[in-house]
């Protein structure tokens, strides 16, 4: 049976992960949350008292505490570093505010991109991140670049944090997201940008179902060829 690689990129809180999970489940594909991998690397640095710019020591930690994924009894994604479940801790504000610095480190990116590409060899996959269509899966048959206003993305993150019991301030989130956009778009290594052959879709005011429908239709067009 024909299967394809689907790359979904976009800035923070543009809806990538939520949509990617649903599409992967609907197609019976593997879903890989690359953002969780960079968050895990950031978490390792912070909890081990290592500077978030010390790429050699962070890469050593990644070898010592490998990142892996699992599922709970409800099918929800779990993230581990070594044997530690870090599913919730990696969403902490301290991790969020430092992950761009870690994601900009060439050696860390090289290590995690290699791992991501290895996982993608298994067959049909939906991967989301910042550089999937440009660096990780440049040959992906379907590349989507999701965008949304800062205001809408801050509101989404606010709701997510509230549901997780993380105390947050909406105005602060707007500032943090705008700052992260700048860092992600202007870093030297693998900056956030749409691939030349990506389809850009503005999710502002669009429901999750609407975004899933749009991407699913594009995938079906390719699979039906």
Curated annotation (Swiss-Prot):
GO molecular function annotation: ATP binding; CMP kinase activity; dCMP kinase activity
Catalyses which reaction(s): CMP + ATP = CDP + ADP; dCMP + ATP = dCDP + ADP
Binding annotation for ATP: 10-18
Enzyme class (EC, first level): transferase
Alphabetical keyword list: ATP-binding, Cytoplasm, Kinase, Nucleotide-binding, Transferase
Domain of life: Bacteria
EC number: 2.7.4.25
GO cellular-component term (any): cytosol
Location in the cell: Cytoplasm
Gene3D superfamilies, A to Z: P-loop containing nucleotide triphosphate hydrolases
Biological processes annotated in GO: nucleobase-containing small molecule interconversion; pyrimidine nucleotide metabolic process
Family to which the UniProt record says this protein belongs: Belongs to the cytidylate kinase family. Type 1 subfamily.
Protein name: Cytidylate kinase
Species this chain originates from: Streptococcus suis (strain 05ZYH33)
Gene (name only): cmk
